[in-house]
Amino acid sequence: MSEYMKNEILEFLNRHNGGKTAEIAEALAVTDYQARYYLLLLEKEGMVQRSPLRRGMATYWFLKGEMQAGQNCSSTT
């Protein structure tokens, strides 16, 4: 993964206290699939975490340790 893209994603998540895959993709001018790919790599590196997976629900991404227990992760898209 390029350092540029890694830094852009981490900066976005820091500024917005997390975000949906589609929001991140739009902000970085990449496809949803590209954003998801980069986010999964960052997750493997232990730098980001995502909301629990639920069928039909949007995935929210956060900097590792930033997701709060009471945070609402139930809205779609």
Curated annotation (Swiss-Prot):
Keywords: Activator, Fimbrium biogenesis, Transcription, Transcription regulation. InterPro entries: FaeA, WH-like_DNA-bd_sf, WH_DNA-bd_sf. GO terms for biological process: regulation of DNA-templated transcription. It comes from the Bacteria. Pfam families: FaeA. Plays a role in the inhibition of methylation at the GATC1028 site located in the regulatory region upstream of the pabA promoter. May, in conjunction with the Mbf (methylation blocking factor), inhibits deoxyadenosine methylase from methylating the GATC1028 site. To E.coli AfaF and DaaF. This is Major pilus subunit operon regulatory protein.
